[in-house]
Structure formats: structure tokens, C-alpha cells
Amino acid sequence: MESTDQNNSIPEEFYSFNTGQPFCECSDCGKDLLEPGVVYVIEKAIRQYAGYTAKDVIFEVAICLECVERIKDEISAESMRNMMKFYEEMMMNGAQVEPGDSLTKCAATGTPRKELTNYQINALCNGTELSPLQPPYLISGEVLDEMNDILSDATRDFLDDYQQKFIGPSPEWITDDVPGGRFVLI
């Protein structure tokens, strides 16, 4: 029988690219994220190059749950309905990815990570640990583009403004030829 004392530490691939350390404050409000009981999400968009081991972090963000809720309040009702429908379809028709494989293939399509050019990894965290409520997961850039396509113009504009204000990257990264390079908050 497997031990229930698993290591729930946040994996290093969810550490800040800039510091090599765990995110310590909310990218939006500056709240201390490493306190026990502080729930937050980490979202990183990554571009990898075929035939190379090099990867670029397109953007990374750690946002406390309070700020996530505030961001969700800015999303139009139309976009929320479209996203809920998209998530339901993805869960019903998506790939069956085992929890231990959640970062090795796209949760929606099952496409192996090594075959993807662009993808986002996401984790729900509580202080210095992964939350047991949801395993980390990976979504391909193509699926993120599908999600972006169902957002209203107002929501897309809000998220683009949010990305530029709090996350970056430089505008040349946010182009139509970089799948999954837009902030979607998944």
C-alpha cells in the first residue's frame, strides 16, 4: 500500500524562472504566498524547440486566490458560459491522463509534452506545497488557442491588458504564430 506521506513540495519547474526559487509573492497584489493556508495558482507558458533541449518561458505568474476571483469577476458572462462549456467538453472528451503523468501530456488531447511546441503548466498551491485538491496539469498551446477563440472581445482585451501590466512578456511574444502565448487563466 502506498504511503499517504507523499512529498507535496512544489516541483522546481514551477519555480520562478528569474530567481530559480519558489514564487514568494502574488504577481498582482504582492501578498506573501509562502504562508501556510495561502492558496494560489502558478501558470507558466513555455515554448520548446524541436531537436533542442532549450526552452523559453514566455510568461509566468503566481496569483493568490483572491486576485484570481477578482480577475474572474472581470470576465464577461458570455466568456464564462463558453469557458464552462469548453471545460465540460474537455473533461468528458479529453484524454485520460493519470495523475503521475499530468505534466507529461496535454490534459485535453493526451499529446505528449515532447511533441508540443508551446504549452502551459499550471499548479494549485497552498503555501509551500501543491494543493491535494488538484494535481498540476499541462495544456497544449493549440488547446489554449481554442479557449482564447471562445472569449468575448471584452474579456480578451481585459486579459491582454492584464498580461501586459502584471506579467509581460514583451509584445513580440504575443503574436498569432505563438500558440498558447496569451494569458488565459486556466
Predicted regions and their residues:
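N-terminal intrinsically disordered, low-complexity tails enriched in polar/charged
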Residues: 1-22, 54, 183-186
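Short Cys/His-rich Zn2+-coordinating modules
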Residues: 2-14, 44-51, 83-95, 122-123
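Compositionally biased, flexible interaction segments
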Residues: 6-7, 17, 21-30, 78-82, ...
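Phenylalanine-focused residue identity feature
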Residues: 14-17, 23, 59, 86, ...
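Short recognition patches in nucleic-acid-associated and regulatory proteins
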Residues: 20-58, 101-137
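Short metal-binding segments enriched for Cys and/or His
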Residues: 53-83, 131-159
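Long, contiguous alpha-helical scaffold regions
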Residues: 88-186
